[in-house]
């Protein structure tokens, strides 16, 4: 369980790096990962998770903007923005239980972001989860 937490943390930090630079630089990400964990399994998983979520960031940002129009991604703290991107990707593309994904994102926001961030991250991710469930129940998307 701790490996998954460290993987999420490292993936969020890599995405934050890319977001701050306004570009995905895989060499910088690898160097950062190498400097932050000795575990090759965590490094590989974090890089894969960050790359996958980064590729979907525009679609995720559009969803988030509909959910929280007063706080579009461009106005969110960078840590929050990238935690939300990562968590929405994980909610949509993995079989990790939603409660685990949301709880981990809240804990990471508590550790790395502002005092208000845990409530904001929770609210956005809860709305995304409800939207996902509504789409499944409508038959718009299939549940795996």
Predicted regions and their residues:
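N-terminal interaction/assembly modules
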Residues: 1-144
């Amino acid at each position: 369980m701790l490996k998954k937490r460290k993987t999420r943390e490292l993936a969020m930090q890599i995405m934050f790096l890319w977001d701050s630079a306004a570009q995905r630089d895989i060499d910088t990400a690898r160097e950062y990962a190498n400097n932050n964990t000795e575990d090759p399994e965590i490094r590989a998983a974090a890089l894969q998770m960050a790359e996958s979520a980064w590729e979907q960031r525009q679609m995720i940002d559009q969803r988030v903007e509909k959910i929280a129009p007063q706080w579009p991604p461009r106005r969110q703290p960078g840590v929050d923005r990238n935690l939300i991107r990562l968590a929405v990707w994980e909610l949509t593309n993995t079989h990790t239980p939603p409660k685990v994904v949301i709880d981990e994102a809240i804990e990471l926001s508590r550790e790395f972001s502002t005092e208000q961030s845990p409530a904001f991250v929770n609210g956005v991710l809860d709305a995304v989860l409800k939207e996902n469930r509504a789409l499944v129940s409508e038959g718009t998307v299939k549940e795996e």
